[in-house]
């Protein structure tokens, strides 16, 4: 099976980290984010993966050239933003059979093998994974028939107007004939394609339970780290009192809660809660970090107090710095 991974965004909500590294290559515990996505695939069924990339494409190509994977990887560049539909259409030359599409910043418990099986059994043009949420207002909502056919889409409805709590969960199985329906140029798969075929009974919904996390913002990045950690999606590092700690770290007299510390970090006499600290960073004594992301090779001075901050790579923060929200340095 051929797989398209949608990874064309700039990752602007994770800036300034993404000014150094494209979002697919940001470290998620002991692997990159895009490798976490590839780990979801049924390896025995996959022979080709196409990464639909739009930002720092050469970095992504170089990374995959040095990976030993059991399938071919092609990095297909977007010269301009194409939307979900345009990005898929841009990969058409590599598609010759039923294919899978998955968002490149998604960690999910969906059983992709079962999704593929149900799709092939149904004979429809498109099948999409569906996840039930309490608040559907940030998502595309679907209406299902009793036999799990999708008959209607509703994009980001008001809570009182939503006709269900089932949302599009970012994993699709499609037939190549879908390309005949796609308009030219940039377009949305959800708004411009699925809305055309759903009323014709050509779409299947596949509900699943468990988790569905998209690592697009600092809070959801932390949630994705937490999900990978709890689900044991890591092979190096250690579990230290329910915190993930990478190799060769020196952590002295520090209280840590629900945090993720990458390789070669030094933390002295500080309080770290619900935070992610990337490799080769130093946190000096007396500092307090909460819901904070610290980039690689950063140095946090003594007695700093940070909450809901994203700290840039290579930053040097002076002693006593206090900040709530935003980026450091301020940009």
Report the location of each language-model feature.
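C-terminal accessory/binding modules appended to enzymatic or scaffolding proteins
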Residues: 245, 250-269, 273-278
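Glycine-rich hexapeptide-repeat left-handed beta-helix
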Residues: 93, 265-331
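N-terminal glycine-rich phosphate-binding loop and ensuing alpha1 helix
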Residues: 1-61
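Short internal beta-strands
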Residues: 50-54, 129-130, 293
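Catalytic-core segments of class I nucleotidyltransferases/pyrophosphorylases
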Residues: 99-100, 107, 113-120, 134-136, ...
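Conserved beta-loop-beta/alpha segment of the NTase-like Rossmann-fold superfamily
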Residues: 60-146, 183
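Long, charged amphipathic helices and adjacent flexible linkers at domain junctions
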Residues: 229-250
